Amino acid sequence: MARKSLIQREKKRKKLEQKYHLIRRSSKKEISKVPSLSDKWEIHGKLQSPPRNSAPTRLHRRCFSTGRPRANYRDFGLSGHILREMVHACLLPGATRSSW
């Protein structure tokens, strides 16, 4: 189980990313439209003004039940070993164990 502080940090980053999403997107569009280099530098400075944790690359996908940051399946939002346990217990509809 992940520490609660790490899970809360991820939630805070998600909130910040949603808050500054429009600012980042509009600044990136402006950079592509402006022809002069000096104006691009000014807009780039604006792009750096939001907090670092508001960048979408700082977000990390975590397991829904345990908070584990690695080996997550996007479709289920679970880490590998929790997914396996839930499939064996028939808690995930439509998921079957493979056999060959």
From Swiss-Prot:
The keyword Cell wall biogenesis/degradation does not apply. Belongs to the universal ribosomal protein uS14 family. It is found in: Plastid, Chloroplast. Part of the 30S ribosomal subunit. Transmembrane segments: none annotated. Binds 16S rRNA, required for the assembly of 30S particles. This is Small ribosomal subunit protein uS14c. It comes from the Eukaryota. It comes from Buxus microphylla (Littleleaf boxwood). Keywords: Chloroplast, Plastid, Ribonucleoprotein, Ribosomal protein, RNA-binding, rRNA-binding. HAMAP family: Ribosomal_uS14_1. PANTHER family: 30S RIBOSOMAL PROTEIN S14, SMALL RIBOSOMAL SUBUNIT PROTEIN US14M. GO terms for molecular function: rRNA binding; structural constituent of ribosome. GO terms for biological process: translation. One of its GO terms (cellular component) is small ribosomal subunit.
